[in-house]
Amino acid sequence: MIIVSTELNKISKRLTQDPSQPASQAMMYGAGFTDEDMKKPIVGIGSTGFDGNTCNMHLNILAGQVKGSITRGGMVGLGFNTIGVSDGISMGTEGMRFSLVSRDVIADSIETICEAHYYDALVTVVGCDKNMPGALIAMARLNRPSIMVYGGTIHSGHYKGEKLNIVSAFEALGKKVAGTITEEDYQGVIKNACPGAGACGGMYTANTMASAIEAMGLTLPYSSTAPATSEKKKAETLALGKAMMHLLEKDIKPRDIMTFEAFENAIRVILVLGGSTNAVMHLIAIAKAAGVKLTIDDFQRIGNTTPLLADLKPSGKYMMEDMDAIGGVPSVMRLLAKHNLLHLDCMTVTGKTVGENLKEAQDLPTDQDLMYAWENPIKQTGHLQILYGNLAPQGSVAKITGKEGTYFEGPARVYDSEEAVNKGLEANEVKSGEVIVIRYVGPKGGPGMPEMLKPTALLMGLGLGNECALITDGRFSGGTHGFVVGHITPEATEGGMIGLVKNGDIIRIDAVNRVLEVKISEEEVTKRRAAWVKPAPRATSGVLYKYMKLVSSASEGCVTDN
């Protein structure tokens, strides 16, 4: 039962109404508060906006629109910024080690300002991959009325009649190395892949997490698919004031929404849409912050009864803007509900349940081919497969859409860093039929568990994407496609079996039986383990050093507050 709250400023009044806090009040009056403002609820508006990348460059504008809506709704909106890392910019460089780290820095910084300044509620305006889980972790920790606004997806780029996206630019390098693209066309792809503001446009990590969070009920409906520069996105920001006041009046908090059943809804949606492997660790981390027990095995359990239906990039042909045109996530959720695969009684930030929200949505159109028919799916079960075996006794995450097959066996080609594998690919070291092993790039080994999009994109561009497999204790971008297995746990730096693999060892990847193993004898394992020496840490000070000391394994969500 939802109780109507009569004290909407019950947190901020510690500063605004307490006569023993004159200095607090003096500073607030100095910042422009009126006597009436001191009685109103204070809503923090946290933006990850910053210049120089398409995912985040417009977020401060959206945050300004949110602030206006909050003010008109009878509250005080206080804007603040936190950081972000552009995966697209840092990918393939040492800078990528800071990407996953940024998730926890975002969460910590939002928690810090909201706790220190006694905000009654929170709106987060976020864009790139780690922004969303960082914001949700903070919301769960704070447990004050909260809404996330997704910055929105980018529109497609175009060059010589071809639709482009950010992965087009990554894969163009492989084509250049292979000699299948001219320098002029290479530059043409680069300069036309990203036409303006918005997050990377396929079912990559940003759009995956936005879809998951909308399915959980922490955004307004259609937030995940509305393009960044659309009128629909602007309308979303202008609706925030009314929505937030309703949450405050009903005292609906994130943990009322972030139930185990809500996480199951989120997983179901990203599986049917073909979402990123990163969703596994991010949802586990968010669940931990919310006090919900979620494990990698829950993804497998749900995936066993969830078909892959969406023909979205990276493995398909459509973009998120196309998903928006056919009804967005609510229409997909209506389809799942018809097959009794959703929990419809979960609460959302609209103040209504999932089921009540879906009554206002439309069914998917019959004249579209983005979403396959239920009876004729792309894959009968989920594309995110949890593999175990002697290479991953604590689990790993494979992204198998079915287009690349379900079984691969071949000799290992081992690299101890992403830089080494990229050089090897550009030098044509990798041969058809091999399993590329990239290790010492896990959460502690990286440190920071960087994404391996550059090598997988090079493989695709070289024409080896369907002829090789790639396994790693690092991560993959949502833009990765091909026969790939990541999040191998334990990681090499922690003595994991992946650190003992040698060139030529036969590696077996069986997505049907969910097995990841290297075919060597126990005697050989014992011999190699005795000879193994833990490498020196790659960070000895600063944020990467702190992260390396605190971070948990990939299977546990890479959290830093265990």
Swiss-Prot record:
Indicate which residues the UniProt annotation says bind Mg(2+).
D87, D129, K130, E451
Q: In which pathway does it act?
A: Amino-acid biosynthesis; L-isoleucine biosynthesis; L-isoleucine from 2-oxobutanoate: step 3/4; Amino-acid biosynthesis; L-valine biosynthesis; L-valine from pyruvate: step 3/4
Q: Which UniProt keywords apply?
A: 2Fe-2S, Amino-acid biosynthesis, Branched-chain amino acid biosynthesis, Iron, Iron-sulfur, Lyase, Magnesium, Metal-binding
By its UniProt entry, which Gene3D superfamilies does this protein fall under? IlvD/EDD C-terminal domain-like (3.50.30.80)
Residues noted as binding [2Fe-2S] cluster in the record, renumbered to the chain = C55, C128, C200
| Catalytic center residues | S477
What's the Enzyme Commission number for this chain? 4.2.1.9
Q: Which InterPro entries match?
A: DHAD_IlvD/Edd, Dihydro-acid_dehy_C, DihydroxyA_deHydtase, DiOHA_6PGluconate_deHydtase_CS, ILV_EDD_C, ILV_EDD_N, IlvD/EDD_N
**CC cofactor:** [2Fe-2S] cluster; Mg(2+)
Residue numbers of N6-carboxylysine PTMs: K130
Instruction: Work out whether the entry's keyword set contains Magnesium.
Output: yes
Q: How does it assemble?
A: Homodimer.
Q: What does this protein do?
A: Functions in the biosynthesis of branched-chain amino acids. Catalyzes the dehydration of (2R,3R)-2,3-dihydroxy-3-methylpentanoate (2,3-dihydroxy-3-methylvalerate) into 2-oxo-3-methylpentanoate (2-oxo-3-methylvalerate) and of (2R)-2,3-dihydroxy-3-methylbutanoate (2,3-dihydroxyisovalerate) into 2-oxo-3-methylbutanoate (2-oxoisovalerate), the penultimate precursor to L-isoleucine and L-valine, respectively.
Q: Which family does it belong to?
A: Belongs to the IlvD/Edd family.
Query: What name appears for this protein in its UniProt entry?
Result: Dihydroxy-acid dehydratase
Per the UniProt entry, what species is this protein from, by scientific name?
A: Cytophaga hutchinsonii (strain ATCC 33406 / DSM 1761 / CIP 103989 / NBRC 15051 / NCIMB 9469 / D465)
Q: What's the encoding gene here?
A: ilvD
